[in-house]
């Protein structure tokens, strides 16, 4: 969809969720749009959840290295900031989604990987939240938070 039609669809979805009290599962690669339309966000890598939290928390304080890279790769609206921004790329080969490697799915591409990341699969676990919502739960699947 072109940008104007995309914005109209997203605005309509937002209005419908408010007016009708709907819950949506919105799957997208555009994290800015996800942040705009959703209250909570989940980030996946190779079919596995790596981070869950409020959209603001995940977008402004990403915990998982993959989420950090995704957020950093979003283009800046200000052309001066975009021009001066350092390039963000993920090194390494993408593992096969059919033959998922042992341990953390992101380990071979993670700049912060430790030896046990390639052996032990991290599970989603709570990390401190910055949300004022007492019902908010922030979860991250990363050995950095063991």
Where are these regions (language model features)?
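P-loop NTP-binding/switch modules centered on Walker-like glycine-rich loops
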Residues: 1-83
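Charged, flexible cofactor/metal-binding loops and thiol motifs
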Residues: 54-146
């Amino acid at each position: 969809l072109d940008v104007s039609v995309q914005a109209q669809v997203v605005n309509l979805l937002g209005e419908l969720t408010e007016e009708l009290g709907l819950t949506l599962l919105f799957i997208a690669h555009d994290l800015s749009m996800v942040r705009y339309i959703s209250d909570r966000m989940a980030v996946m890598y190779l079919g596995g959840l790596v981070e869950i939290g409020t959209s603001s928390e995940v977008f402004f304080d990403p915990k998982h290295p993959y989420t950090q890279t995704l957020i950093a790769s979003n283009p800046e609206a200000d052309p001066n900031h975009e021009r001066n921004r350092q390039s963000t790329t993920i090194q390494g080969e993408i593992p096969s989604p059919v033959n998922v490697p042992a341990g953390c799915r992101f380990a071979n591409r993670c700049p912060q990987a430790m030896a046990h990341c390639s052996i032990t699969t991290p599970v989603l676990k709570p990390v401190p939240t910055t949300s004022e919502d007492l019902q908010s739960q922030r979860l991250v699947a990363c050995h950095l938070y063991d």
